[in-house]
Amino acid sequence: MARSTCRRTNVIVPEEGKVMKKIAVLFPGIGYHADKPLLYYSKKLVMNKGYKIADVKYGVLPSGVKGNPEKMLEAFKLALKYATKQLQEIDFRSYDEILFISKSVGTAVAAAFADENHINARHIYFTPVPESFAYIKQPGIVFHGTADPWADTELIKTECRKRNLPLYITENANHSMETGDVVNDLLIMKGIIENVSSFL
């Protein structure tokens, strides 16, 4: 897995004796839910590191969004509406550290939600779609596979460079960060979670 240097940003050092209050919010993709590997293992990792978890669940979203900008925008707006409704009771100001973990279209939802609600979050962006970069402004790390049919690798590289986002590229991995070789996919997942752990 190719990678660039990962830098820690916006990390708050607690006063001596104070336990940091941390929350992680999971923003899934349209068909990639929190029980699938990238989000499942990320969730377990951050739980072990003391984060409270909030799982966003979307309602019905449009199908056939791939390659259809209008449907993609419609899906994004609906997903953002669902997320906003579910997260409105959380007082993010009460947390010392806020982490948004997102997948695919969820990367746009997470970025837009943070921006609209003035939430200072760090992000883990799994396989963002090109449209996501219109909303991505905050620091984080990005994961992308070169066989992802939803996003061109050169475009992802360019957009990450513009925003100074560390980008982890896996050769021949698809939109789920898998290659079809089960043993290799397990090794890929291990590397991804290790990189996520280093970012935290």
What are these regions (language model features)?
Residues 101-110:
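Gly/Ala-rich beta-loop-alpha elbow adjacent to hydrolase catalytic centers
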Residues 142-144, 148:
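Short beta-strand/loop motif that positions the catalytic acidic residue
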Residues 149-155:
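Conserved alpha/beta-hydrolase "acid-adjacent" motif
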Residues 21-94:
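Serine-hydrolase catalytic machinery in alpha/beta-hydrolase-like enzymes
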Residues 173-187:
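Catalytic histidine-centered segment of alpha/beta-hydrolase-like enzymes
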Residues 119-129:
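A conserved short beta-strand
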